[in-house]
Amino acid sequence: MTIHIALLRAVNVGGRKPIIMAELRDLLTELGFVDVRSLLQTGNLVFRGNARRGIDLERLLEEEAAKRLDLHTDFFVRNAEEWKAIVANNPFREEAKRDAAHLIVMFLKCTPSAKDVEALRAAITGPEIVSADGGQAYIVYPAGIGRSRLTNTLVEKKFRTRGTARNWNTILKLASLAED
């Protein structure tokens, strides 16, 4: 069985799209997945299931969450090997060591073009640094995320796709859960 990590977009953030993690775990169990675990209350799941392409699994989870839980949101799924590569390919290792909370990985529905990445970089007005790698973007927020004008909305607009972000601490915790 393949280990998968699923991230939900914008749940339990600022009172939007409230969901109880136990309900999500139960949903995945009802769908036939095993060893379903969650991390934090922001929609992070680790589970085992038969090998499927990430996009097929995302579609299944989105449809079933909408139908059974009335939860309309995006799911972003990576398998454990892909997750290891995300950790290994971090272009900002020094920044991660210095302040892991100020490094995020934004998971994207579609891979941005080089032109879109350059458009985002050109739109940055602060000290933020962006590096895109396939379906992920690594973003360093030296002055903190809360004060930055580089918002998820701006990233999505410039990349022309939806995404969800997790800080480096959460990325590493999910990597550890996927190894257990």
What are these regions (language model features)?
Residues 2-42, 46-180:
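Surface-exposed, charge/polar-rich loops and edge strands
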